[in-house]
Every structure is written in C-alpha cells, then in structure tokens.
Amino acid sequence: MPLRLLLLLLWLWGLQWAETDSEGQTTTGELYQRWEHYGQECQKMLETTEPPSGLACNGSFDMYACWNYTAANTTARVSCPWYLPWFRQVSAGFVFRQCGSDGQWGSWRDHTQCENPEKNGAFQDQTLILERLQIMYTVGYSLSLTTLLLALLILSLFRRLHCTRNYIHMNLFTSFMLRAAAILTRDQLLPPLGPYTGDQAPTPWNQALAACRTAQIMTQYCVGANYTWLLVEGVYLHHLLVIVGRSEKGHFRCYLLLGWGAPALFVIPWVIVRYLRENTQCWERNEVKAIWWIIRTPILITILINFLIFIRILGILVSKLRTRQMRCPDYRLRLARSTLTLVPLLGVHEVVFAPVTEEQVEGSLRFAKLAFEIFLSSFQGFLVSVLYCFINKEVQSEIRQGWRHRRLRLSLQEQRPRPHQELAPRAVPLSSACREAAVGNALPSGMLHVPGDEVLESYC
C-alpha cells in the first residue's frame, strides 16, 4: 500500500477521535466506508450531470470534497463533506475552490470552515511518524539508486569480471534501480491526500491521471522484476551447489527470460482486470482484494521459494564448514557471516511479514510492520551493492590491478622509451578474476577441490 494512501487512512482513523455519538465512538471501518460512499455518490452525480456548453472546469472528487462542473473564472462552493464525524458542528460551512479562466482548477482551495474544531494530538503525532517514514524510504531508495549505478558501472567496465554470476548480479542491480526510480516517480505523481488549507492546497492531478496510472503499472512491473531476479539469484546459487557437473553458462538466457519476462505474466492480467473492474483514481487503492492478489500471490511464491532455497543453502554451509572445522575453528563465525550476507541477496527478510496483510494488523504492530518493510526494502539495494561489489575481494583486486596498470602506463609514458623497447603490462588471465564454479579442480596441495567451496567463497 502506498504510504500516501496510508496517510489518508490514518487521517480518517484520526477523525474518529473527534466525536462520540449516542451509540458510541465511530469505528475506523465505518468511517472509511462513509468516506468511500461519499466518493461513489460523487461519481454517480457527475455521470448523470450534463457538462455546461461553455468553458468549464471538470467535475471531480479530490479525495476530500465533491466538485461539480464549474464555469471558468468563478469560485466554486460546496457544503462540508457529510462523512466528517464533526459534520453536525460544521454543517453550515463550505469548501471553496477556484476555477481559472482557462477552464482548469487552480491550486487554491479553502476548507477552513470544515476543519475539526478539536485538534487531536495523537493523530498529529502518528501523521508525523508516517511523514518521517516517507522521508526515510526516499533517502533509502535515493542512496540505493546511487550506489547501484556505481556498482553496475564497475562490473561493466572490468571485462575480467564478466561471467554468469556477475551478469546475474548486474541484472539484479538493474532491477533494484528500476524499482527505486519507479517508486520515487510514482510518489511524485500520486494524488496528494488529506486536508489542506489556503495556499497549501496541492495542484489538481486529474490532468496527470494517465501518467500516474502508467507510473503505477511500471512500479508494479519493476517491483515484480526485482522479486524474480532475487529468485534467479537463489536458483542459480542452488544449482551451483547442488546440481554439480553441469555448466550454468548456457542457462543465462533462461534466467533473463525468467527475470524480465515472468513479471509480465501477472502484471498484464492485473492491468486488464483493474481497468475493467476497478478503474478508479490512480489505481493506488486496492479495494477489491481479489484483484490485488493477482500480483501479491506470485510475489509471495517467489519469497517462499527463496526462503526454502536459503534453508537448503544453510544446510550445505553447515555441512561443509563442519568438515573443515579442524582447519577453520571459527566456522560458527563464518556461518553467521555467510548467513547475513545471503539474507539481502535472496530477500529472506521478506518472509517475516509476508503472510501478514494490511487488514490483519492494527495499531503499533501495523506501524512496526510498515517501518520494517520500508526500511529494508529501500536500503536493500544499497546493502546488495556493498556486499557483492564494493567489498567483494574479486572486485577490489580488479580495481587495484587496474590502478596499478594505469600508474605503470603513466610511468612508461614519462620515461618515453623507444618503440621497440616499450613495455606493456602483463595481462591477468580471465580465470583469476571471475571464476565459474568447476567440479574436480585440483588444489595446489594435490587434493581434489570440494564441489561448492569456490562458490561459497565467491558469495559468502
């Protein structure tokens, strides 16, 4: 659920504190139903109303009040919305909005006559918490976007790092970048929710509805692609460790098809059903839960599969580290480090709250779930880029070698040697930088290489 929508729900929830009728306090569900019913009545009214013949502003429900068609260069006035719990206290009040001379709604809106006479401190505090969470995930996605772009450039520029494993990493980095960019773009296009006063009223977004829905579709695809590439990482690592004796180089096209093609299999049906059955606003509200499960179900399946792969890999890690316990007495520390390293790569943290829906949690648990998911999702790309690029030993070795080669070339240019005496830096074999897993490799000691050890070293 987008954070701006949650801000609206929190606002509606906060309204119930303001008034208690003879039958008791209004529940959150009843309040939301009244607000939803108000919006539906507005849509029906607009459908049955003939637009004026001259230049006029379009009728719309701006998530607060219902506005009829209004002649250009006039100020529209409507009664305070009846869904407000304190409506009896402000029933004589009005909301005002300016229709410009060009037939477009202006940014000015005044509903001071409809404001709650009694401000609620608890609601304001929780609204502040959600606004800070939005700032946090904006910082997280921005940081992830920057570090992922740098990591992608590093893996692309150093040719000796080109192998199937790093190709998959690069596609995963790209999916994280697209997810971050799509979410940040969607936030800018989503309709501002909640009440505003005077000059704080936001610019109407009806004209950008198509762009907003397009951004919503792209966001769902990018999020789905991110989960499928996390699944590709898990499947690839599992194949390297379990299905020994078979090369993975020829499977990369299948991984590409799975990573970028699978999300379209559930996003396209969701778009069609959403357009036919729930074509409202910017598609940010999921009122018909069956439609939302078209997207949610495949994502939950990928999370579950990756969690099972994670458990399987942990079993392999434990068995291999125990066999080398005499040589590696700190195997428990290495196991803990490997476990923590694989968590962001496979998205294992998602399994904590994945089975819990928005309707199943309330109060503090809902905020805890939201904060947990927002923090880890926004900073996950940053963690993956750091763990699998910036502090990766192979990447660091290539950067050092590239720096030494550059210094050597500069030194040779300064010495100005004769053409037949010019020296070239010695190339490093491909296998020394990016090694694919091989079965039966001989170690310097003459012992046979244990299948999977090199893979675990590369990942963990």
Swiss-Prot record:
Protein name from the UniProt record: Gastric inhibitory polypeptide receptor
Origin species: Mus musculus
Keyword list, A-Z: Cell membrane, Disulfide bond, G-protein coupled receptor, Glycoprotein, Membrane, Receptor, Signal, Transducer, Transmembrane, Transmembrane helix
Cysteines paired by S-S bonds: 42-66, 57-99, 80-114
PANTHER family, alphabetized: GASTRIC INHIBITORY POLYPEPTIDE RECEPTOR, PDF RECEPTOR-LIKE PROTEIN-RELATED
Keyword Phosphoprotein: no
Similarity field: Belongs to the G-protein coupled receptor 2 family.
Maturation and modification: N-glycosylation is required for cell surface expression and lengthens receptor half-life by preventing degradation in the ER.
InterPro entries: GPCR_2 (IPR050332), GPCR_2-like_7TM (IPR017981), GPCR_2_extracell_dom_sf (IPR036445), GPCR_2_extracellular_dom (IPR001879), GPCR_2_GIP_rcpt (IPR001749), GPCR_2_secretin-like (IPR000832), GPCR_2_secretin-like_CS (IPR017983)
Record's signal peptide: 1-18
